[in-house]
Amino acid sequence: MVDPLDIRAMKFARTEFERRGFDISRVAITSNRGVIHVTGIIPLPQAMADDTYKHEMEVIKQVLRVKTSTKQVILETHRL
């Protein structure tokens, strides 16, 4: 049976990426036992510099850890 906390964490992760303007159509977000995995390709928005991209990813990781009470957030993404 799927843990409701994992479902809530996945939905929150999708919402957080979309809220910050990232296209996550080629990204798989999964959550299992308090660990969120984000894998895939994230196109770099045109107005975003490389340093800003890295900063936004770190902010998203921190927000996901705090708001969803996850143990770890693993980002295995590539930029276009």
Model-derived segments and their meaning:
Residues 1-80:
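N-terminal targeting leaders
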